[in-house]
């Protein structure tokens, strides 16, 4: 059996975590046992949960895509709320942890995990009532990858679907920091690896170009801003949090 909106067998997706030794992120921090355990113990985003509750009341159905779901920090609570959740990630250990949590909470009929990159989502057009990009788009290594990820999110979102964004702000870095050559918002100064740090204007423009309009129901927030006169926050990123909506 397959879902008409998602051409994969859900049980196979869940069980794949336990039988596959393939891990695209093997050896990276994202698949390290300590990192996975830390993510598995992290509390869900309270603002996201409140937004998801309202979206569940508004939507005629209840399908949510959690991009970069990790160990299920938000995906498991979303399933508990009543959403049918598809969580994607590129770390097998993270997906295994999310699947294990779903089984422990008897939510394996509501949470399905898939090994997939954010710019190639294995779902049909207009499949989801809510899309979550929580700490994932900032990991894009180029503007091209970032824009493809936004385009994919727009493709699989139903018209009017909500989008919850949690991503790095340009204010994380000193004003004099220079982006990677040829890139408008990709920097290496934070971690040594290319990552996306957009200004608010850039983020809004990119989402508008992809077909997402701001949702006034969730205030655009910026967390961890440095105090006046401080140029850098050190190892703590400044974070944007906002909601948007897929335009018809």
Predicted regions span which residues?
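Conserved class I S-adenosyl-L-methionine
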Residues: 13-70, 164-188
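A short glycine-rich, Lys/Arg-flanked "PGG" loop and its adjoining helix->strand segment in the class I
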Residues: 147-159
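Short alpha-helix
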Residues: 194-211
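Class I SAM-dependent methyltransferase SAM/SAH-binding core
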Residues: 72-120
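A short SAM/SAH-binding and catalytic strip from SAM-dependent methyltransferases
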Residues: 130-144
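A short acidic, Gly/Pro-enriched loop at the edge of an enzyme's catalytic core
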Residues: 119-131
């Amino acid at each position: 059996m397959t879902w008409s909106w998602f051409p994969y067998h859900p049980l196979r997706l869940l069980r794949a975590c336990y039988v596959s030794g393939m891990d695209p992120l093997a050896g990276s921090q994202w698949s390290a046992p300590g990192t996975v355990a830390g993510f598995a113990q992290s509390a869900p985003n309270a603002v996201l949960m409140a937004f998801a509750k309202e979206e569940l009341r508004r939507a005629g159905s209840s399908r949510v895509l959690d991009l970069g779901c990790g160990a299920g920090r938000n995906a498991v609570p979303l399933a508990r709320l009543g959403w049918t959740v598809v969580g994607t990630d590129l770390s097998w250990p993270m997906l295994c942890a999310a699947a294990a949590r779903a089984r422990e909470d008897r939510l394996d009929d509501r949470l399905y995990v898939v090994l997939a990159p954010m710019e190639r989502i294995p779902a049909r057009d207009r499949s989801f009532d809510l899309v979550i990009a929580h700490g994932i788009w900032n990991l894009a290594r180029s503007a091209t990858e970032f824009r493809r990820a936004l385009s994919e999110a727009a493709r699989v979102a139903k018209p009017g679907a909500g989008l919850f964004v949690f991503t790095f702000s340009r204010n994380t870095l000193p004003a004099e920091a220079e982006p990677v050559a040829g890139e408008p918002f990709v920097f290496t100064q934070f971690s040594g690896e290319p990552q996306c740090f957009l200004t608010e204007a850039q983020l809004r423009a990119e989402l508008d170009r992809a077909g997402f309009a701001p949702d006034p129901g969730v205030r655009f927030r910026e967390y961890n801003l440095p105090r006046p006169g401080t140029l850098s926050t050190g190892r703590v990123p400044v974070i944007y949090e906002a909601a948007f909506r897929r335009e018809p």
